[in-house]
Amino acid sequence: MKPVNIFFIGRKQGVGLRRFRLSHLENRRPAELEGLRRASSSIHQVRLIRNADVVWVRVRPEFTTDPERRRIEQRLRPFRDQIPIINDIAVFNNYDCKDTTFSIWKEHGISCPDFISFDTFQYTYNHSDTVEQILKFLQKYGKILLRTNNETAANGMYLLNSNATGKEIDAIVDDLENRCRMFFPTRSGTRIIAVEFIGSQDAGGYIDLYRAHILLGQIISYYAVTSKQDIFHNVDMKEQCLERFIQLNEGLCDKVQSLNDQILQASTALECNLGAVEFFLLDNKPIFIEFNPMWGGHASMIGFGNTKVQNYLDTHKKALKERIPNIYAWLNYPDYYKALFEQINKSIQPIVH
């Protein structure tokens, strides 16, 4: 199969004085460069965008400013109708602003949490009305997340239970207002949102979070993590969660296949063609909560769970590899990214040749 040429562009690559350098891969994950080198018979990185068969926009949304977006947009505009673009900067708000994401999903009949959002005028000039709306929303659902709409890693996020008072909410809104004012000059889409909390449906109190990775209309990988914490990250998964973690991933292949169309629709509705979509399962039906165009968290760098979980998965690899192949395929980072770049070739080939 003929190799395709790829051009990378981001905040620090493919624009300005950095537009011609090949020695850098923005937001690279461990072993991603090695994977790109291993896939050299399928894909070549090029220095000039006009020589590309495909362009990959690589930005970390939470650090990307409006001026940086405009620079990338200006660079892409002359080529947009000529070259396929992976995650065009034109759809940045679709995944960066959680309220925009939820709105689009709801418009397409895709299940996601309920939410309300407040623009700058509302919470600056109608502070008391904002607090009142949040109180009513909390009364409706009993537990909610109050947060900024475009931060990650639980930054700018509060979990409110039904016993939260108006005074407590008022103080949180004050803090979030200050965060919005700090970000607004360079990230004008920043807003306050209240989001329905999707809690545990498990008798043991576990919350199971599923993630599927999508590339150009294909699900290329997936996994599930679990915890008893209301808000948790991969690193929070402890050894007590191991049995459930293994069970969840053991049956995940068939489950993902049955949800294939719904998972892909969550991506295409946002006009994104690469990224990680996160969801819960309630009565075996997905509730989508987030789309991340550049996954690069704990699982992508170190592995699953805390050190004890990682050690267990490593020492029991021989016994577990047949049961949870998706986990070990993911952890083999060089081969994983080699396969990712080869898949770009397979997907782009019919378009360019």
Q: What function would you assign to each model-found segment?
A:
Residues 70-72, 99-100, 206-209, 274-275:
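Short, surface-exposed coil-to-beta transition loops
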Residues 277-279:
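Hydrophobic residue at the +6 position relative to the catalytic HRD Asp in the kinase catalytic loop
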